[in-house]
Amino acid sequence: MKFELQNQFVAPSIEFLKRLPLAGYQSIARTRLIKMLADKNDEIVGIQQDLIKEYAKKDDKGELIVKDNQYTFTPENETAFQKAYYELMIENGEIEKATYSHHKEDCQDFLLNADINVSGDEATCYDALCVALDVDFDKR
């Protein structure tokens, strides 16, 4: 299965999918989708760490400086970091993994028929996931 999803929705999609009450083949489809998203999330976290290493202040030994459990930045580097981080998060990430022949259709089905109330950020995440997986609400 292959689809694109904005990076900012990858981690929240995992949490959203975990909340869905599913059984049988739908649960299996969800678990495989979560694994795909988790792999993409690991990639995003790695890139975030690379950005921190590039822009955060370092001591004379080259170690990142952490103050009050936060990395420190010069004003210029903080602006550059925030810009790079924003660009990373709004980027459409390509997610692809061989699963099984009807995986996408199974995911579309459980998303279309999800019996869960959502609002706020979770609703935005649900919508992004439905768009990414081409869920057709006209079928309802």
Predicted regions mapped to residue ranges:
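N-terminal interaction modules that seed assembly of large macromolecular complexes
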Residues: 2-60
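Low-complexity intrinsically disordered segments
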Residues: 49-140
